[in-house]
Structures are given as structure tokens and as C-alpha cells.
């Protein structure tokens, strides 16, 4: 078969949300840090992200991971997180999906009952424990980068009213909002309304507030909106729905969103150190999380969290890139997000 370029992926889902892990075909990325490699990817090879994420090969909430050589001397593997909306410094459900794919495809040595990895990500070093039985990844736990509350805001939003939100970071920036306060019921049949309100709120917040990570200036702008409400699953403490860029719903409880939520709960003395917290998604899937340590980020109080979830292997793809295909980079039928990742400073 004659084709110009071939990309091989392993597809998994974590709590219903997809991860497409690219295992071959990625050019060598340059940079002394994973953030620099991510920005090199964006500048020179963004067409690969579009090919793999956008329709007709992907869909509006497709996400994935690119495996690279790590930059950190203690890391085993470098990971860059991608989605239809662009690039993420960190992604929890993708981390669970990537590690499950690595184990079950035999790409890394497997140690039972626990295989430990250190991932180098644009957000920092992430330590992972994969619980393995009979060669299968049963659960994945990762210690996330420090999570913190950046600010609490109140903003008037046209056609919605006064919105109160905690702007919290757990690997991405989240506006964490009580769903009932903005007239939302977090059920699949209300998905369109949830997305519309989230995008409207996100745009207003980005217009009126400066949101920048105090240590990594390339991480800026509100990208995710996380609504929460009472749980419906008997094992859960909170039910959430996260709207991801550019405008789709995370089917999982969202790993970095769970870290951000734990930062809010801990700061408000609503959860204790090492107390288990179970987060439910809009489709009923669950993540477990807990605060395992405290730290500081630029003189702000922060927490280190451990997030646990499971992913499922779905299959493999070989994608062919044909220069003559008029839709070689795909398309999206939703508006692009205005926020852009800036250069590393």
C-alpha cells in the first residue's frame, strides 16, 4: 500500500472519555523541557494533532497523547496531551488511558501487582502506579502536580445572572460552579444547554479576569468549566460535568478537574488529608481522589492529590496521511476556542 505517512495509535476509554495514544509516526520534537517540546509540536506539526483528533477520524471531544523521550532525568516517558481544542499541560483521564495502553500492549516491562512509572509532562513530573493482574491494568493511580485555588470570583453573565466560581488549577484552569445556581441539571439529555452556558461563562470570565499560572506563564486563560451537583451514584460524594475546549463534555469525572475540586474542598476545610473522595461523571463513571500532601506554589497554598481510575483498551488504528485528501487535517462542526497557548517564558 502506497501512502505518504502512517501513524499508529492505541485507543482506550477512561470512564467513557477517549484517549488516542500515538505510538509511532511522531517526528522528533525539540526542546529542553516538555513545555518546549509541546510548543515545537504546535508550531511545526500541529497538522498531526488535527489529523488524529478532528473529524472524520476523531470527533469534537476526541483527546489523545503523544509519547516522546522525556526531558526530566528521573522520568521514564515523555507525554504531550492533545485534543480537538489544542494542547493541555496535563490530563488525568489521558494519563490513565496512556498507562493502560502501555501495559496491555506490552510496550513497557510489566511488574505485578504494581508497575510504577514517572511521566514527564508539560505541567511537571507525574508519578504513576498501575495495578496489574494477569497482564491487565485494573486501576491506575497518579500523583498529580500541585493543585490550588487561584481566586474566587463573582461575575454577572447576560441571560444567566450572577455567577460565583472558584478558579482552581489541577493541571488546567477550571471555573468550578454549583450547577443549581445557574439553573442546570447535570444529565445527558441537557448536554447542549450545559455546553452553551459553559462556553458563555468561560468567554465572559476570560474577558474580565486575568488567569495565569504563577510559575508557568504559558499556562494562561480559563479553558475548562466544571459544574457540580448532588451525586446520583450511591458510592459518589459529588457529581460533576466538565466542559472542555473548544466546547464538548468530558464523559469521565475528569482527572485534573478532580484535583482542582479537591483543592477547593481542602481549602474550605470540607475534606481531610487522605480522606477518600469519589467523583461521578455525567454518564455515571467514577474516579477516586484524595489529598496526600500540602505544598506551596508561588507562596500560595496548594495540595498534592492522588487520582485513581480505570481505562479500557478498545483497539488500534493505522492512520494514513494523504497530501491530496482535501480533508487531510479534518474539520470540526463547533466553534474554535479563543484561548491560545503562548510561548514559554
Curated annotation (Swiss-Prot):
Pfam annotation, one family: Pro_racemase
InterPro entries in the cross-refs: Pro_racemase_fam
GO MF annotation, one: 4-hydroxyproline epimerase activity
Coiled-coil blocks: none
Family named by the database record: Belongs to the proline racemase family.
Name listed for the protein in its UniProt record: Uncharacterized protein BA_2834/GBAA_2834/BAS2643
Source organism: Bacillus anthracis
Amino acid at each position: 500500500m502506497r501512502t505518504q505517512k502512517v501513524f499508529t495509535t492505541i485507543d482506550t476509554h477512561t470512564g467513557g472519555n477517549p484517549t488516542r495514544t500515538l505510538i509511532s509516526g511522531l517526528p522528533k520534537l525539540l526542546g529542553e523541557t516538555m513545555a518546549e517540546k509541546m510548543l515545537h509540536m504546535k508550531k511545526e506539526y500541529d497538522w498531526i494533532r488535527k489529523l488524529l483528533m478532528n473529524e472524520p477520524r476523531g470527533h469534537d471531544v476526541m483527546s489523545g497523547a503523544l509519547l516522546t523521550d522525556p526531558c526530566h532525568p528521573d522520568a521514564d516517558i515523555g507525554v504531550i496531551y492533545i485534543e480537538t481544542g489544542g494542547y493541555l499541560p496535563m490530563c488525568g483521564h489521558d494519563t490513565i488511558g496512556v498507562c493502560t495502553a502501555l501495559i496491555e500492549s506490552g510496550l513497557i516491562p510489566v511488574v505485578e501487582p504494581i508497575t510504577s512509572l514517572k511521566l514527564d509532562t508539560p505541567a511537571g513530573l507525574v508519578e504513576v502506579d498501575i495495578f496489574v493482574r494477569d497482564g491487565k491494568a485494573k486501576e491506575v493511580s497518579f500523583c498529580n502536580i500541585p493543585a490550588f485555588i487561584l481566586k474566587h470570583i463573582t461575575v454577572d453573565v447576560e441571560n444567566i445572572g450572577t455567577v460565583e466560581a472558584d478558579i482552581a488549577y489541577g493541571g488546567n484552569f477550571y471555573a468550578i460552579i454549583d450547577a443549581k445556581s445557574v439553573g442546570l441539571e447535570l444529565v445527558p439529555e441537557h448536554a447542549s444547554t450545559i455546553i452553551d452556558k459553559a462556553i458563555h461563562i468561560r468567554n465572559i470570565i476570560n474577558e474580565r479576569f486575568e488567569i495565569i499560572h504563577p510559575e508557568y506563564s504559558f499556562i494562561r486563560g480559563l479553558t475548562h468549566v466544571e459544574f457540580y451537583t448532588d451525586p446520583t451514584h450511591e458510592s459518589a460524594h459529588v457529581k460533576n460535568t466538565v466542559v472542555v475546549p473548544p466546547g464538548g463534555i468530558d464523559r469521565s469525572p475528569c482527572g485534573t478537574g478532580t484535583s482542582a475540586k479537591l483543592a477547593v474542598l481542602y481549602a474550605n476545610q470540607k475534606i481531610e488529608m487522605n480522606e477518600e473522595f469519589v467523583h461521578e461523571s455525567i454518564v455515571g463513571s467514577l474516579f477516586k481522589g484524595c489529598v496526600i500532601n500540602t505544598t506551596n506554589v508561588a507562596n500560595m497554598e496548594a495540595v498534592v492529590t492522588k487520582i485513581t481510575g480505570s481505562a479500557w483498551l478498545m483497539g488500534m488504528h493505522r492512520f494514513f496521511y494523504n497530501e491530496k485528501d482535501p480533508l487531510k487535517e479534518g474539520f470540526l462542526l463547533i466553534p474554535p476556542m479563543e484561548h491560545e497557548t503562548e510561548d514559554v517564558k
